[in-house]
Amino acid sequence: SSLCRMNGFDLGDKAHTAEADTSGMNRLMKLISKKNPELFKKCISLNDKKNVLSSIKDVDYFCHPETFFGRTRQFTSSYLCEHPVYKGYHLVFDLKHDPEAMFSEKSNEVLKKVLNGAPKKYRTIKANKNPFIQDKSFATNYGDEYTTLGHEILEQRANFIIENRKELANRVSLIISDQFE
């Protein structure tokens, strides 16, 4: 209701009822489609989970938000593989970490500890949850560690993943599968 109020259509005392929330969401979507049609098309393009894989696998790297502990953070990642247990869940490598240094570790036991240690080295994108995938050009817009790294290093890290994807995916899948046995 606060988003509606901020955009000039207060829902009044009916806020948080099914009818008012639906009406408010409808008006917000119309406003977004009018003011920023490209953003609107991008948002609804990933409603179909079949479109998600190509939007993350067919590019070298991309940006996506993730919310945890009530805080939304922006991540820049490169596609690794589908989750070995949960179909439609896609594992992506967080490019703030150096994949070449990490995967140079030959022992899967040591790699498992590194991958699962804090901070997380990979993230999960759920195709059926309408993820918001942004172009890589957004990577350096937030004044964070990705800005410090810059596009050149992000590109190098993404290329390492792409060139070695099959081997990296096999190792990560094996490590994750072992956790489910």
Protein language model features and the residues they cover:
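Acidic, Mg2+-coordinating catalytic module of metal-dependent nucleases/exonucleases
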Residues: S1-K50
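Generic serine detector
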Residues: S1-S2, S23, S33, S45, ...
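Acidic-enriched, low-complexity/disordered segments with a strong bias for Aspartate over Glutamate
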Residues: D10-D13, D21, D48, D58-D60, ...
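Residue-identity detector for threonine
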Residues: T17, T22, T67, T72, ...
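Residue-level signal for secondary-structure boundary elements
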Residues: P37-F40, N51, S55, A169, ...
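Acidic catalytic cores of enzymes that act on phosphate-bearing nucleotides/polynucleotides
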Residues: C43-I125
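Non-catalytic terminal regions of proteins
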Residues: A101-F103, L111-E181
